[in-house]
UniProtKB/Swiss-Prot annotation:
Molecular functions (GO terms): anaphase-promoting complex binding
Tissue expression summary: Expressed in embryos, germinating seeds, hypocotyls and pollen grains.
Species this protein is from: Arabidopsis thaliana (Mouse-ear cress)
Role of this protein: Plays an important role in organ size control. Acts as negative regulator of the anaphase-promoting complex/cyclosome (APC/C). Regulates cell proliferation during early development by targeting CYCA2-3 for APC/C-mediated degradation. Required for mitosis I during pollen microspore development.
Effect of inactivating the gene: Growth-related phenotypes, such as formation of large roots, leaves and seeds, enlarged meristem size, and reduced fertility due to defect in male gametogenesis.
Keywords, comma-separated and alphabetical: Growth regulation
Assembly and oligomerization: Interacts with CDC27B and CYCA2-3.
GO biological process per UniProt: microsporogenesis; negative regulation of organ growth; pollen development; positive regulation of protein catabolic process
InterPro entries: SAMBA (IPR037547)
Location of region: Disordered: 1-40
Name listed for the protein in its UniProt record: Protein SAMBA
Length: 100
């Protein structure tokens, strides 16, 4: 006989002793009250989401700062070959036509 099986639990014994109805089991469970300070599942989920979002934003801020610090490597002249190598497309600046 396993003491952990539902057939041998206190609620099952109470239900059988109370006439086999669910009223005995319900009465046994009604006597147990949860303290009001236990957080609900939704509150725990919301708190976990807030923590995850805060951690994510911290990591994203670090990444943005790193990219901003490295942005000098990407500044400067870029290839403009695509502006001059298509049929008849020339770089136009101030009304004059340039090849570069």
């Amino acid at each position: 006989m396993n003491g952990a099986s539902p057939a041998h639990s206190l609620v099952s014994t109470t239900a059988v002793a109370g006439g086999g109805g669910s009223s005995g089991a319900a009465a046994g469970l009604d006597d147990f009250h949860f303290p009001p300070d236990i957080p609900s599942m939704q509150e725990r989920k919301d708190e976990a989401m807030r923590v995850l979002k805060a951690d994510l934003m911290t990591e994203l801020d670090k990444e943005v700062k790193s990219l901003e610090e490295d942005s000098w490597m990407f500044e400067g002249p870029r290839s403009r070959i695509h502006l001059i190598s298509r049929r008849g497309n020339f770089l136009k600046k101030g009304g004059e036509v340039k090849l570069w």
